[in-house]
């Protein structure tokens, strides 16, 4: 399948991105540094990249940015201030909602930074600065390697804006390759998900957008109802859904959110739900543990999503659905 091939291409995407100088990164960093306001837009997976961009910009370089879903921006153009910067993210560069968001913001004298894979696209032409994902064609409808490529570009912008932010792309690429060498455990977990109706994915901080992206991958590839929830919101409603019929994926790397997220996992387990832990630390609370590499905190999102992409892929095979071309979906949504 194309989807599996594209998942396995991600170490190369990381390595290539680390080794090449991307045209426009410096210009993009300058534009962001001097911007009155920064907005980030995208649809689907690209919007989930925007959520991570917001967090890394504020955490590492103290720059505030506002993510807006592309399809929502057109109904609230008054939220956009004139002379701002819009970072528009789209793999195809032809997403109708993203192009409409760009059209609206351009009218307000906003500068556009286009993050795009297809360099012959409409979004490329509309960008004041264009950052190419450079990850090669992505055939599978569900975004995999393009998500990683988007995040790498956003990391490089943050690196350019900040001092002393070192990202070891080569080392990171190697650790992802190693993780991809042994997927037996993920394939076993996929068998367990075959008859499941509901999966919840829990994360805090920078891991929460990964919970949302994980839910999207599971929906797209397996047709299982999946929902990403912020860990701290568990007692504000989602805990009522926890029982012996559900699986919960806990995104829990060894960062500042670790202890609180583990506490949430224990509360969920006490209600009888099965727990899949995605972490670099094993815990007795997990019924199944997917080990991720120990790496710097900024890189956790990529190392967390890749095993979930695989889990969604293998679950699709178990359920006999087509992982490359999910029903009712198109690779590029060119109509509203």
Q: At which residue positions do the language-model features occur?
A:
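Conserved phosphate/anionic-ligand binding catalytic regions in large, soluble enzymes, centered on
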Residues: 3, 44-53, 208-220, 305, ...
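Active-site-adjacent beta-strand anchor residues
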Residues: 7, 251, 301
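Glycine-rich phosphate-binding loops that contact phosphosugars or nucleotide phosphates
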Residues: 33-171, 204, 251-297, 311
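In a subset of proteins, long, contiguous C-terminal domains/tails are tracked
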Residues: 56-64, 222, 284, 299-336
């Amino acid at each position: 399948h194309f989807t599996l091939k594209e998942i396995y291409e991600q170490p190369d995407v990381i390595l290539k991105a680390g080794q090449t100088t991307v045209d426009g990164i410096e210009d993009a960093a300058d534009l962001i540094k001097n911007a009155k306001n920064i907005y980030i837009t995208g649809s689907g997976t690209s919007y989930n990249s925007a959520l991570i961009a917001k967090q890394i910009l504020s955490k590492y370089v103290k720059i505030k940015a506002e993510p807006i879903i592309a399809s929502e921006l057109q109904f609230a153009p008054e939220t956009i201030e004139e002379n701002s910067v819009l970072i528009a993210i789209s793999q195809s560069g032809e997403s109708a909602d993203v192009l409409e968001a760009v059209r609206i913001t351009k009218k307000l004298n906003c500068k556009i930074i286009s993050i795009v894979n297809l360099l012959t696209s409409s979004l490329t032409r509309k960008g004041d600065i264009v950052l190419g994902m450079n990850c090669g064609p992505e055939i599978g409808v569900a975004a995999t390697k393009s998500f990683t490529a988007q995040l790498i570009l956003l990391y490089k912008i943050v690196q350019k804006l900040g001092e002393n932010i070192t990202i070891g792309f080569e080392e990171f690429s190697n650790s992802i390759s190693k993780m991809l060498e042994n997927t037996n455990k993920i394939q076993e977990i996929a068998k367990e998900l075959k008859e499941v109706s509901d999966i919840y994915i829990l994360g805090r901080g920078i891991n929460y957008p990964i919970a949302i992206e994980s839910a999207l991958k599971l929906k797209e590839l397996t047709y299982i109802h999946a929902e990403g929830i912020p860990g701290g919101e568990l007692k504000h409603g989602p805990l009522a859904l926890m029982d012996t019929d559900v699986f919960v994926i806990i995104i829990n790397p060894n960062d500042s959110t670790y202890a609180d997220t583990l506490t949430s996992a224990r509360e969920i387990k006490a209600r009888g739900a099965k727990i899949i832990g995605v972490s670099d630390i094993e815990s007795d609370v997990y019924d199944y543990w997917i080990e991720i590499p120990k790496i710097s905190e900024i890189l956790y999102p990529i190392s967390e999503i890749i095993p979930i992409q695989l889990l969604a892929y293998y679950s699709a095979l178990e359920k006999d659905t087509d992982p490359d071309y999910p029903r009712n979906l198109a690779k590029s949504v060119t109509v509203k």
